[in-house]
C-alpha cells in the first residue's frame, strides 16, 4: 500500500511539473504571436513606404523627364522589393500554419495529461475504497472467530451439563432400586432431567447449525478477500499504466518545447531579414 501511495504522489508531482511546462509553452506561443503582430505592423509600414515611393516616382516622372534612366532603375528595385515582400508574406503564412499545428499538438497533450490525472485520481479513490472494505472484512472475521469460540464454549458447557445429567440419572436409577418409597420424587426428578436433556439436545442442534453457518460465512469472507486482493492488483496495474502515460506526455511536452525553440529561431531569422530589407529600402 505504501508503495502505491508513493507512486501516486510521484505521479501527481510529475503531473504538476508537466502542467507548469505546458503553461510555459503557452506563454512562448503568445510571445511568438506578439512577434508575428510586430512583423505584420512592420510590413504595413513597408507597404506605406512603398506607396509613398510610388507617389514620389509619379511626381518625379512629371517634373523630371531627364531622370528616366534613374527612374527605371528605381522601378526595377521596387519590383524586387515587391518580390521580397511576397516571399516574406509567404514565409509568414507558413510560420502561422506551423504555429497552429503546434497549438493543436499542445492542446492534445494537455487533454491527454488531464485524462491521465483523472485516471490517477480514480485509482487513488479505488485504492481507498478497497482499504476500507478490507478493514471491514477483517473486523467481521474477528467477530466471527469470537462467535465461533463462544459457540465452542457453549457446546463444551452443554457436554458438561449432559454428563452431569447422565450422572444424576444414574444416581436416580440406583436410588430408585434402593428406595421404592421415593419413587414419586425420583420420577419427578427424572422428568426434570429429561427436560434438561431435551433443552441440551436442542441447544446442541442450534450450535451445530450456527457452526455450519459460521463456516459458510467464513468461506464467503475468504472469497471476498480474494476478490478484493485481485481488484487491488488491478488498481496497482492501472496506476502503473497511468504513470507510463504521464511519462509519455512529458516526452511530448519536451518535444513541443524543442519545436517552439526552433520556431523562435526562425522568427529571429525572419526579423533579421526584415530589418535588413527595411535598411535597404530606407537607403532608397
Swiss-Prot record:
Residues 103-136 are annotated as: Disordered. Belongs to the tropomyosin family. The N-terminus is blocked. Tropomyosin, in association with the troponin complex, plays a central role in the calcium dependent regulation of muscle contraction. One of its GO terms (biological process) is regulation of muscle contraction. This is Tropomyosin Tod p 1.0102. The keyword Repeat applies. Gene3D superfamilies: 1.20.5.170, 1.20.5.340. One of its GO terms (molecular function) is protein homodimerization activity. The reaction of this protein with ribose in the Maillard reaction may be useful in development of processed seafood with low allergenicity. Homodimer. Keywords: Allergen, Coiled coil, Muscle protein, Repeat. The keyword Repeat applies. It holds the Pfam family Tropomyosin. Expressed in mantle muscle (at protein level). The molecule is in a coiled coil structure that is formed by 2 polypeptide chains. The sequence exhibits a prominent seven-residues periodicity. Residues 15-273 form a coiled coil.
